[in-house]
Amino acid sequence: MQIGQRLGTPLSPSATRVMLLGAGELGKEVIIALQRLGVEVIAVDRYPNAPGHQVAHRAHVIDMTDPDALRALVDAERPHLVVPEIEAIATDALAAIEAAGVCEVIPTARATQLTMNREGIRRLAAEELGLPTSPYAFAQSFDEFAAAVARIGFPCVVKPVMSSSGKGQSVVRSEADIEPAWRYAMAGGRVNHGRVIVEGFIRFDYEITQLTVRAIDPASGQTRTSFCAPIGHLQVAGDYVESWQPQPMSAKALERARDIAHRVTSALGGRGIFGVELFVRGDDVWFSEVSPRPHDTGLVTLASQRQSEFELHARAILGLPVEPALATPAASAVIYGGLDEAGIAFEGVRDALAVPGADLRLFGKPESFAKRRMGVALATGANVDEARERAKRAAAAVRPVSAR
C-alpha cells in the first residue's frame, strides 16, 4: 500500500483494504468515512449485526480476545491496515502481526497495547514522560486494593485496568464503599480480571477531550501533530451524556493541554486521531487517559467541524491531509435505550429534527438496554450554551418504544 499516494477500487484486485476491530457507533462512522474515499472495509465485532457490520463490505463475528481467531481472520482477509476501535482485543496478536509484516496496525501495535490497559498508559504518562496526573496505585487482590485505598485516601476513583464507557468505575468515599467498589470493578473489567487502578480525586473545574491528530504533512512528508478545538463534556458514572465544542478555557490552560496531548501522542507514535482526556482547574491541567482512535465525546464533531473526528481519522491513517478546524459551536446529547429489548423503535424523530440546528444519529444497535447508548442528538448554535440547549431538547424528544 502506497500511503497517501494511491487508493484502489473496492472489491477489486486494486482495493485498499482496512479491517476495523470493533464495529460500534464510532466504528460505523469511521467505516462510512473510509468508504467515501473508496476503501474496502471489513468490520469485526463480538456480536452480529453491530452498527458497523450494517455498512461494511464484509462483516465477521469473532472473539477478538482470542489470538488464534484474530490471526486467522487477518490471514484470511489480508487487510493493508488493521484499526482497533475497542479495548477487548488480543493485543499480543496484533504485535505479532505487525512484526511479521502482515499489515500495519493503527496507530501502532505498541500504542494499542499501552492504551488498552490503564496501567500501561499511566506508567508511560506519569513515570516515563513526567506528565501531571492524579496520585495512583494498582491492585491485584482485595487486600492490595484496600491498602491502595488507604494510601490514596478518600475520596478516590476505582477503575478496572481494562474497561470502557465507565464500566466497573466508581467513587470510594468511605470505608463502606470499599468492598462494593471492588465487586463492581471485578464485574466491569473486560479482561485481566482482578487488577484495578485507584486514583486520587482531583477537584477540577471541568473535563475536556483534546482531539489530537497525527497525520502526514503533504509539504514535508513528515508526521505533523494538529489539534481540534477542546471538547467539554459531562460524565455520569464514567459515561458521557453530553459534549460540546469549543470548551472555553484560558490561553495558558489550552497551551498546557496541547503540550500534554502532543507529548503523550508523540510517545505513542503512528498515524490517526487520539482522544486525550484531561482535567482542568484554572490554568492547571492533569492527564487522565488517552484513546488512540475517535472518542465518544467527539461525536459532536459531526456537527461542529468540516471534517469530523471520523473523517480526520480516516484521512490520517491513509496518509492524506487533514483540516481539524472548527466550523461552528455545537453540542451532542446521548439518547439511551430506555428498555431491555431487541429491535426497538424510536418515536418523536420528527419533533427532534424540528429543533433548529438539530440532527440525529440513531446507531442501529440490534439490542437495547435501559442505559445503553442507542443514539445521539447533535445541534449547532450561535454559542455553546444555545447548542447544548438545542441538543438536549432534541434528545429528549426521541422516545424509544417497544416494537412488539
Swiss-Prot record:
GO function term, MF aspect, one: magnesium ion binding
Stored Gene3D superfamilies: 3.40.50.20, ATP-grasp fold, A domain, ATP-grasp fold, B domain
Pathway entry: Purine metabolism; IMP biosynthesis via de novo pathway; N(2)-formyl-N(1)-(5-phospho-D-ribosyl)glycinamide from N(1)-(5-phospho-D-ribosyl)glycinamide (formate route): step 1/1
Record text on subunit structure and interactions: Homodimer.
Gene of this entry: purT
Binding-site residues, N(1)-(5-phospho-beta-D-ribosyl)glycinamide: E25, L26, E85, D296, K365, R372, R373
Keyword ATP-binding: yes
Keywords of this entry: ATP-binding, Ligase, Magnesium, Metal-binding, Nucleotide-binding, Purine biosynthesis
Family annotation (InterPro entries): ATP-grasp, ATP-grasp_carboxylate-amine, ATP_grasp_subdomain_1, PreATP-grasp_dom_sf, PurT, PurT/PurK_preATP-grasp, PurT_C, Rudment_hybrid_motif
Top-rank lineage group of the source organism: Bacteria
Catalytic activity annotation: N(1)-(5-phospho-beta-D-ribosyl)glycinamide + formate + ATP = N(2)-formyl-N(1)-(5-phospho-beta-D-ribosyl)glycinamide + ADP + phosphate + H(+)
Binding site for ATP: R118, K159, S164, S165, G166, K167, G168, Q169, E199, G200, F201, I202, E207
Chain's role: Involved in the de novo purine biosynthesis. Catalyzes the transfer of formate to 5-phospho-ribosyl-glycinamide (GAR), producing 5-phospho-ribosyl-N-formylglycinamide (FGAR). Formate is provided by PurU via hydrolysis of 10-formyl-tetrahydrofolate.
Protein's name in the database: Formate-dependent phosphoribosylglycinamide formyltransferase
Location of the ATP-grasp domain: 123-318
Source organism: Burkholderia pseudomallei (strain 668)
Listed HAMAP family: PurT (MF_01643)
UniProt KW Cell cycle keyword: no
EC number: 6.3.1.21
Sites where the protein binds Mg(2+): E277, E289
SUPFAM superfamilies: Glutathione synthetase ATP-binding domain-like, PreATP-grasp domain, Rudiment single hybrid motif
GO cellular component: a single term: cytosol
Entry similarity comment: Belongs to the PurK/PurT family.
GO biological process assignments: 'de novo' IMP biosynthetic process
Signal sequence residues: none
